[in-house]
Amino acid sequence: MLKPLPSEGFSWVGYIPEKAIPFVEFLIDEHNFTLKIVSQRQTKHGDFRQLPSGKFQITVNNNLNKHQFLLTLVHEIAHHVTHQKFGRVQPHGQEWKTVFQHLMLPFLRPDIYPKEILSLLAKYLQNAKASTDSDVNLSLALKGNVAEAGKYFIFEVAYGSVFSFKDILYKKGNKRRTRYECLNMKNQKVYLFNQNVEV
């Protein structure tokens, strides 16, 4: 049975690819947690926590597209399952990576993820990181290689140009392998930006 969002009456089914619905429904029923869809957060796409009541809650940002939302949801379910099976272990350690790979297997299908994302996703899952944003190619593919309205990816900004990020001005500098050196105009320190950061 599909679980509506608490107090909102909306269903999560509109947030994921249609062919993924039965698999997600099974995971929600099997692992007994509340799924809460929340407003965009700057620092994370989702999280898993045990509430003071002892119940488990997973939150996922409402601004993600269906493919990002599904991946984030399964990422957080993997934290929950890892907690159930192994107790307190490293948040993105080997136990979590193994559980995450296992939970993602049913979703690695061309009727759920487009082919251009599937190969990148399979590669990412071989050694998943805390955030899909750390894998630049996967992150860009999940976003459809399109930045949010009114923003640009840092790699699209011209060398030497000044841009704003979190209300601070930076000047784009040289590229180091996968990241760009950017000078904070206020404190004159150099920071490294992943090339998929939106500014």
Label every PLM stretch briefly.
Residues 3-51, 57-58, 63, 87-199:
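Metalloprotease/metallohydrolase-associated module, dominated by Zn2+-dependent proteases
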Residues 65-69:
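Conserved short loop/helix modules at catalytic or binding sites
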Residues 70-71, 93:
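Conserved strand-to-helix beginnings and helix N-cap segments that scaffold or border functional pockets
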Residues 71-84:
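Active-site recognition of the HExxH zinc-binding catalytic motif
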